[in-house]
Amino acid sequence: MTDASVKETFSFQTEVGQLLDIVAGSLYSNREIFLRELVSNASDACDKLRYEALTNPSLAQNADEFAISLAVDKKAKTLSVSDNGIGMNHGDLLDTLGTIARSGTGAFLDALKSEEKGDIGLIGQFGVGFYSAFMVAERVDVLTRKAGEDESWLWSSDGKGEFSIEPGERAQSGTTVTLHLKKDAKEFLEESRIRHIIKTYSEHISFPVRLDTEALNSASAIWTRAPKEITEEQHTEFYHHVSNAFDKPWHVLHNRVEGTVNHTSLLYVPSMAPFDLYEAERKSHVKLYVNRVFISDNTRDLIPAYLRFLRGVVDSQDLSLNVSREMLQSDPKLAKIKTSVTKKVLSELKKKAKKSPEDYAGFWQNFGPVLKEGLIEDPALRDRILEICRFSSTKSGDVTSLADYISRCKEGQDAIYYIAGDDARKIAQSPHLEGFRAKDVEVLLLSDHVDEFWLQHITEFEGKPFKSITRGAADLDKINEGEKADDAEEEAQAPDLNDLIAALKLELGASVKDVRPSKRLTDSPVCLIADEGDIDVNLERMLKRHGQLQDAMPRVLELNPDHRIITKLAERAKGSAAASDTLLKDAAHLLLDQARIADGETPADPAEFVRRLGSVMDSAL
């Protein structure tokens, strides 16, 4: 039995000096979170009494008016956090505030789970976060009385190795933690500072947090309510709160998962792209809560970077936290939550794309390039992501899915054709497309920077390989078998380009890898392609721009055998004076520079380009 009239002094079971070094260092570098921890503990105490009262009605005297109260005494330089929750007795104080590695509330949560009553939410970190109070306080007093008991107790410590417990006076159950603030912590006596901290960290604690009589939080965790109970206006208001945005959410995803890891997610897809969407840090903006207590709004292991446009909350009572609550442990439960949430988001986007294609096209314009990052970063879900990707194409102004593209493939078409570049408008006008348009073969127009990179990881879709129309042979011969007779007749009538090709190779030398007749050109005289097996034209350009490739590889110059310029030059190349023909030599370089310009590049030698152009024009006049 404890003598109720004697003040007792104890040593902490874990060296407090070492603990406070941790608390004051990297784990608790942001001092304001001490208030979050104390409010969280107060909320836990109220939750615990609310549950106990279900089976012990005599404890229910405060069950309908649980609250957390903050009080400031500027003269005494104290800040107090009070609750009317379960309270503590002498033994609880020894266990929870005298032992670092143990938590009475944690033990209660384990017992709760063993009774399979997972609908009662508790968080089990009391006794750990409590010590963050010593970051700002030179002494901490805890006055408490356990529900259903008559004795009150006062715990006190300066955090220097010992604490005392003595009888106290308290009229009702609950706990008051009083911080005697250090000289450098006077900011926490200011009401505006306290309001800001509560708004930031404890807005959705399910009990009111009051300063005097003013409620500082909404005391309503909207995500814990049934989806049908939440109005569109309430969703918009909450979205504005968690996102600091002013648009309306494009889509709402409210999901509750019960199983291995219980969690609730309330996520919003914005209708406008956030300003920081493409910042290098690629931060997540989904807030992580543990039982309605805010933990972090940039937990990299909660939401993949390719879903960083999401706003909202994920709340779980099953996560374990480290001593600071600033960093999550390497907890496999968090990985399971991440996978569950990610799959749900991708599933919802797939439904939205099928139900409202036009609406989804607007989403894709805002967030498509970001979502496609997942094709590189998330191999496990790559197929799901690819299903909901959309692409511009030569067919119409609308974006298309790969499945729809394949449904429109021509007879004999065994590849998904694409052209990539920086500018969507320019690549849509590329001469490389001419032969494909002539045969009504659809080509995807890829203008996002990420496109060239995911194509290095994904080589096919539904059995059809991706093929760039700026690399290798055009492969148009086998498409539309019925047109082969016409193609054969055209080839028979095509001029002999052998002499011209030889002359161009001789003049251009190492500037080109090869010169060939083209089957992809119908209107333009020439184009440049990468040879089969070489780096694609656009990827090479990107690598050079970022300093990852020094020298460009020579490309293949393709000639349109039906173009008047080519036929005239072919005739000229047959002459006996072709080897010394200045106009033919100038024309060779002009054709190469024309192909470069069509690809969005500049002539190799602008001054020579101008001279040659002037010379050829002069000869023609």
UniProtKB/Swiss-Prot annotation:
MF terms (GO), sorted A to Z: ATP binding; ATP hydrolysis activity; ATP-dependent protein folding chaperone; unfolded protein binding
Residue segments, region B: 326-541
Superkingdom per UniProt: Bacteria
Region (C): 542-621
Assigned protein family: Belongs to the heat shock protein 90 family.
The name this protein goes by in its record: Chaperone protein HtpG
Known function: Molecular chaperone. Has ATPase activity.
Subcellular location: Cytoplasm
NCBIfam families membership: PRK05218.1
Subunit structure: Homodimer.
PANTHER family xref list: HEAT SHOCK PROTEIN 90 FAMILY MEMBER (PTHR11528)
GO CC terms: cytoplasm
CDD domains: HATPase_Hsp90-like
UniProt xrefs under SUPFAM superfamilies: ATPase domain of HSP90 chaperone/DNA topoisomerase II/histidine kinase, HSP90 C-terminal domain, Ribosomal protein S5 domain 2-like
InterPro entries, A to Z: HATPase_C_sf, Heat_shock_protein_90_CS, HSP90_C, Hsp90_fam, Hsp90_N, Ribosomal_Su5_D2-typ_SF
Organism: Roseobacter denitrificans (strain ATCC 33942 / OCh 114)
Gene3D superfamilies reported for this sequence: 3.30.230.80, 3.40.50.11260, Heat shock protein 90, C-terminal domain, Histidine kinase-like ATPase, C-terminal domain
Keywords (A to Z) from UniProt: ATP-binding, Chaperone, Cytoplasm, Nucleotide-binding, Stress response
Region described as A: spans on this chain: 1-325
PROSITE patterns xref list: HSP90 (PS00298)
